[in-house]
Amino acid sequence: MCGKCVALCPVGVDSCGLKQAQRAVVNNSLPYDYKFLSTAGHAGAAPQNNDNGVLYFAGCMTHLTPAIIKSMTKIFETAGEKYLFADKDGGVCCGRPLMLAGKTEAAKEVIAKNTQNIMESGCKTVVLSCPICLKVLKEEYNLKGITLLHHTQYINNLIQQKRLVLNKTAESFVFHDPCELGRGCNIYNEPRNVLQSIGQLKKAGKEKKESICCGGSLGSLTLDYNDRIKITQESLNILTCNNPDKIVTACPLCLKTFSDQSSRPVVDIAQTVAENICNGCIKQ
């Protein structure tokens, strides 16, 4: 379900859509049902006025990689952003795992509750660190009047607006295009712009729409663990062919998956940005 087959299919067959539709028919036969996600969380954002600024929707996986949340908090504070957390006390599921498991009705309930929380927050912009959440909110939620941004887009905007100034380092980076961010949301340039403002950006063996999945896909419900590891190792080999100092990604699932197998440092782009903020360079 990484989307590469769809992106490269010469006749445009939506194999991911076909798989998901089939799972909705046979969902009782799947080994995982994600029942623990069927109850929506409560967004921590309380309505205050007509524009509370930015709502940060971290999501389930980002709460398992707290360094991303810590880094985003520093970025918000440095930029002088008015912001609220949608899920400060625990990850709010976007509904995607339920959809992938064929639990369509349960997913609709989660989506309806999250939509209500977002609309009642008073925020006009939602920033997400998880590209899986971003894709679902774009495609499945009715959020009229709300701007949805992945944190790479948001950070890139801050840099262009000179609300965030970064130090230049001698480090070299390679960027891994997460499946849902690249092939799913067509976001390729913003993360590269951000990294080039910090250090040297090296090329991977396969990039953009040809990028290899990290191996941690939520959609591969029956894939053997050893097969997942093979995918992860293949992706790491492709990413490190030009010997970068660090592997940078922009998805909490990719970060967690790569970090477990890589001998080289793996970080989220928000961490790289937060570590290289030029203190005292921004005039508030």
Model-derived segments and spans:
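Iron-sulfur cluster-binding electron-transfer modules in prokaryotic oxidoreductases
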Residues: 4-284
